Swiss-Prot record:
Heme b b566 binds at H97, H196. InterPro entries: Cyt_b/b6_C, Cyt_b/b6_C_sf, Cyt_b/b6_N, Cytb/b6-like_sf, Cytochrome_b, Cytochrome_b_C_euk/bac, Cytochrome_b_N_euk/bac, Di-haem_cyt_TM. One of its GO terms (biological process) is mitochondrial electron transport, ubiquinol to cytochrome c. Its cofactor is heme b. Keywords: Electron transport, Heme, Iron, Membrane, Metal-binding, Mitochondrion, Mitochondrion inner membrane, Respiratory chain, Transmembrane, Transmembrane helix, Transport, Ubiquinone. The keyword Transcription regulation does not apply. GO terms for molecular function: metal ion binding; ubiquinol-cytochrome-c reductase activity. The chain crosses the membrane at residues 33-53, 77-98, 113-133, 178-198, 226-246, 288-308, 320-340, 347-367. GO terms for cellular component: mitochondrial inner membrane; respiratory chain complex III. This is Cytochrome b. Changing V232A: In strain: Isolate LHS 541. It comes from Clethrionomys californicus. Changing I348T: In strain: Isolate LHS 541. The keyword Metal-binding applies.
Length: 380
């Protein structure tokens, strides 16, 4: 068996990636989220495949086809809610994975980090298009509002929006193409995941100390396969509690009303995992400025390697930057809350303050804290 594992052209790739992979001996549970994201992707592809067997991407039948899945298909309700809540679990794992990378300085592995940012954009695009497919009120108006943002692009904006819509409004053509893209993107994401892993295995994993761990490596299997399996059990338990007891807690009641272009919902808002970016978008009165801020809210992650000023890699031994980091986390929670609130006083000003704080902490305060800590270390 050992000979096959190490010699077979196909199996040896798996062997070098998941079995004999030299791994730092001290990586904590924060390193579990990579494998959990892989699990989420598999769950989403499988449940999505079975949903696609019964779904029809036509404006006249899309809403009723989802109802049909829930009522008439064997365990259709389970597949549908696993897919919807699986997306939420996916984003929880994504945010924790990115947060771990920021805390421990994993962004210094630049190729892996940039590939991760591309993956984040791809997953966000997929989730957005998936939200349009049930063709409820929030699906329709969410699609209208978000695609309309592209009209802020000078000169070509309006033409671009109509090209994406396939007409003069969000309609049948839009729904059909969104379904096509929503189906293909997870497979593109899977390919990108392998590239992400390829870059990661070039450098090896980071660890909580931020130090070189070449002198202290252990094989991935059985140590981290067992550890990852525990994470898998916890994730699946959390997902099934959500699906079986609170399936609609993260959804919007408006999406149980069929799409109606003549009736605008009181508060148009995306799923909870986009609310922080939506709050940043809304906090700028200018349309183009809002769109740029929205894109920058994610793209700013690519600047982290350039903004790293500390002599140490992670935040483990850096209390000042640690404080800034946790203020940033609190700020993101505030933005998420604001994104779900109506556009009125005092939410507008809170959103604007939180948006300024978000960019200021990342671009100014954290690099400054790193330099202050360097100076403290130099004091005799």
């Amino acid at each position: 068996m050992t000979i096959i594992r190490k010699k077979h052209p196909l199996i040896k790739i798996i062997n070098h990636s998941f079995i004999d992979l030299p791994t730092p001996s001290n990586i904590s549970s924060w390193w579990n989220f990579g494998s959990l994201l892989g699990l989420c992707l598999i769950i989403q592809i499988l449940t999505g495949l079975f949903l696609a067997m019964h779904y029809t991407s036509d404006t006249s039948t899309a809403f009723s086809s989802v109802t049909h899945i829930c009522r008439d298909v064997n365990y259709g309700w389970l597949i549908r809610y696993m897919h919807a809540n699986g997306a939420s679990m996916f984003f929880i794992c994504l945010f924790l994975h990115v947060g771990r990378g920021m805390y421990y300085g994993s962004y210094n592995m630049i190729e892996t980090w940039n590939m991760g940012i591309v993956l984040l954009f791809a997953v966000m695009a997929t989730a957005f298009m998936g939200y349009v497919l049930p063709w409820g009120q929030m699906s329709f108006w969410g699609a209208t509002v978000i695609t309309n943002l592209l009209s802020a692009i000078p000169y070509i904006g309006t033409t671009l929006v109509e090209w994406i819509w396939g007409g003069f409004s969000v309609d049948k053509a839009t729904l059909t193409r969104f379904f096509a893209f929503h189906f293909i993107l997870p497979f593109i994401i899977t390919a990108l995941v392998f590239v992400h892993l390829l870059f990661l295995h070039e450098t090896g994993s980071n660890n909580p100390t931020g130090l070189n761990s070449d002198a202290d490596k252990i094989p991935f299997h059985p140590y981290y396969t067992i550890k990852d399996f525990l994470g898998v059990l916890i994730l699946l338990m959390g997902l099934m509690i959500l699906v079986l007891f609170f399936p609609d807690v993260l959804g919007d009641p408006d999406n149980y009303t069929p799409a109606n272009p003549l009736n605008t919902p009181a508060h148009i808002k995306p799923e909870w995992y986009f609310l922080f970016a939506y709050a940043i978008l809304r906090s700028i009165p200018n349309k183009l400025g809002g769109v740029l801020a929205l894109i920058l809210s994610i793209l700013i992650l690519a600047l982290l390697p350039l903004l790293h000023t500390s002599k140490q890699r992670g935040l483990t031994f850096r209390p000042i930057t640690q404080t800034m980091y946790w203020i940033l986390v609190a700020d993101l929670l505030i933005l998420t809350w604001i994104g779900g609130q109506p556009v009125e006083y005092p939410f507008i000003i809170i959103g604007q303050m939180a948006s300024i704080a978000y960019f200021a902490i990342i671009v100014i305060l954290m690099p400054m804290a790193g330099m202050i800590e360097n100076n403290i270390l130099n004091l005799d």
